[in-house]
Amino acid sequence: MENENEKIYVIQKHDATHLHYDLRLEMNRVLKSWAVPKTPPIKSGIKRLAVQVEDHPLDYADFEGTIPEGQYGAGTVEIWDRGKYILKAKNDDKLIFEIKGNKLKGLYCLIRFKGKENWLFFKKK
């Protein structure tokens, strides 16, 4: 039986102008999205910059392939990790959520800092 509190979670490895990882979390019928310049934190003690970018449609969670030259985000996209997540706490500057992925598992945080788009992404101890 599916838990109604479980939402889509996916990280897409995006080899565009600069290799990065796109963290996507289902919220309000869209995928809230953050670009993470370095490998996402599998264990606690590692903090990563996560830059919030535009929302994506839910069906983008399954996208793998090539975005053609000349289009925004041109390059290759592959699914690096996927699963479900449960939101534990949320306010304007902080999200706490449990990830149930293949690579990432456990309690994670996104905390806003230095302006509107910049967040810290890390696994809680």
PLM regions: where:
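A charge-rich, low-complexity, intrinsically flexible signal that marks solvent-exposed coils, linkers
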Residues: 1-125
